[in-house]
Curated annotation (Swiss-Prot):
A GO-annotated cellular component: small ribosomal subunit
Keyword Coiled coil: no
Protein name (database record): Small ribosomal subunit protein bS20
Pfam families the UniProt entry points to: Ribosomal_S20p (PF01649)
Function in brief: Binds directly to 16S ribosomal RNA.
Biased composition range(s): Basic residues: 74-84
GO BP: translation
Record keywords: Ribonucleoprotein, Ribosomal protein, RNA-binding, rRNA-binding
Keyword Endoplasmic reticulum carried by entry: no
Gene Ontology molecular function terms on file: small ribosomal subunit rRNA binding; structural constituent of ribosome
Disordered, as annotated region: 72-93
Source organism of this protein record: Carboxydothermus hydrogenoformans (strain ATCC BAA-161 / DSM 6008 / Z-2901)
Amino acid sequence: MRLVANTKSAKKRILIIRKRTMRNKAIRSAVKTAIKKFEMALKVKPAEEARELLRQAVRALDKAVTKGVIHKNTASRKKSRLTRKFNSVYKAS
């Protein structure tokens, strides 16, 4: 691991940033996975399973907001869109 920084504090900041970047990527990936699972469930699963996966996706989004990975308005927009998708599929039928 080669650090370009000169000062001790700058080297430490680089290490901290790398650690946080890895954590943020993991959280963001978990959010994307939860959303994809929900969207797949809309196509093939019954309403109860899709509703549970919607809850999990919303929970993942809320956790990401709590950790500071995504902005609260972004999460709110995504939750709204997922809920609208759910309602359009299951309320119409």
